[in-house]
A protein has these predicted regions:
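Alpha-helix boundary/capping detector
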Residues: 41, 70, 140-141, 210
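Positions that flank functional sites
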Residues: 30, 59, 129-130, 192
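Substrate-binding cleft of extracellular glycoside hydrolase catalytic domains
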Residues: 2-16, 21, 25-120
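Catalytic domains of cell-wall/extracellular-matrix polysaccharide-remodeling enzymes
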Residues: 84-172
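Functionally critical loop-and-helix segments that line ligand-binding/catalytic clefts
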Residues: 2-4, 141-226
C-alpha cells in the first residue's frame, strides 16, 4: 500500500494484520514536505512492514526546480532515518502531474537530482495513459533511458477491504509495458484499512526481492510468483 498525509492517523499495524507486506510513504509533493512522513515511517517500521518512499514530482514550470524538490526529499529521509541515510530506501518518482506534463528528460534529471542529494532512485510510478501520452522510452540503464523500476497504476474498478479485491498475479496489468514487466502494480485507489481509504499495491516476488526493489536494487529482475 502507499500512504500520505491523507491517511494521517491510520494505524499501519492494522495494515500488517491484514496481510500487507510493505508501505510506500510520500515524502513530498514538489517542495511541500508531507507533515506525517516521519510518523508514517516510524509506524510502518514498528508494525514490521518494509518501507519505501515516493516523491510527487512537479514540473519546474510549476514553480520549483527538480534540485529544490530533491533537497526536500533528502531532508525528509534524514529526519526519518538519520543523517547517514544508511538504512533509508530508494525513492520512487511519482510522474502524474498534469499542469505541465513531465518528459522523459525531466524524470532522468529528477533521478540525477536525487543522486546528487545522496538519495537513490527506485524507479518511476505512473499510469499507462500518462506514459503513452508522453511517448516515454523503454526502461533500462542507458543514459537516455528511464531510471530504475516500474510501478504502474491501473485500476480495474473494484473496491473493498485492502487486498481482498486483488485481481491476481495473471491479470493483464502485469503484462510487459515499454520493455518492462511492472515491478509493482497499484490495482486500486479504493482499498480500505481501519476505516481509511488507501491505494493498494501488489508485488509478486519474495521478501528478498521486495527488499531489493525498495532499496533500489531490483529493476531488471523478473518477480517470482507467490
Amino acid at each position: 500500500m502507499d500512504v500520505s498525509e491523507w491517511q494521517d492517523g491510520l494505524p499501519l499495524s492494522a495494515a500488517a494484520a491484514a496481510g500487507h507486506r510493505f508501505a510506500i510513504v510520500r515524502a513530498c509533493d514538489g517542495t511541500y514536505a508531507d507533515p506525517v512522513f516521519a510518523s508514517h515511517v516510524a509506524d510502518a517500521r514498528g508494525a514490521g512492514l518494509r518501507v519505501g518512499a515516493y516523491w510527487y514530482v512537479r514540473h519546474p514550470l510549476e514553480g520549483t526546480s527538480l534540485r529544490e524538490q530533491a533537497g526536500v526529499v533528502a531532508r525528509q529521509l534524514r529526519a526519518a532515518w538519520g543523517p547517514s541515510l544508511d538504512d533509508a530506501p530508494a525513492v520512487w518518482l511519482d510522474a502524474e502531474t498534469v499542469a505541465h506534463r513531465l518528459s522523459a528528460d525531466d524524470l532522468v534529471a529528477a533521478a540525477r537530482a536525487l543522486e546528487d542529494a545522496g538519495v537513490a532512485c527506485a524507479g518511476t510510478y505512473t499510469t499507462r495513459s500518462y506514459w503513452r501520452l508522453r511517448r516515454f522510452p523503454a526502461f533500462g540503464d542507458g543514459a537516455d533511458e528511464m531510471p530504475g523500476g516500474l510501478w504502474l497504476a491501473q485500476w480495474p474498478g473494484t473496491a473493498g477491504p485492502a487486498g481482498a479485491d486483488y485481481p491476481g498475479d495473471d491479470h493483464r496489468a502485469w503484462r510487459p509495458f515499454r520493455g518492462r514487466t511492472p515491478d509493482l502494480w497499484q490495482f486500486t485507489d479504493r482499498g480500505s484499512v481501519a476505516g481509511f481509504t488507501v491505494d493498494v499495491d501488489a508485488f509478486r516476488g519474495d521478501e528478498g526481492e521486495l527488499a531489493a526493489l525498495l532499496a533500489g536494487r531490483g529493476p531488471g529482475t523478473e518477480p517470482s510468483g507467490g
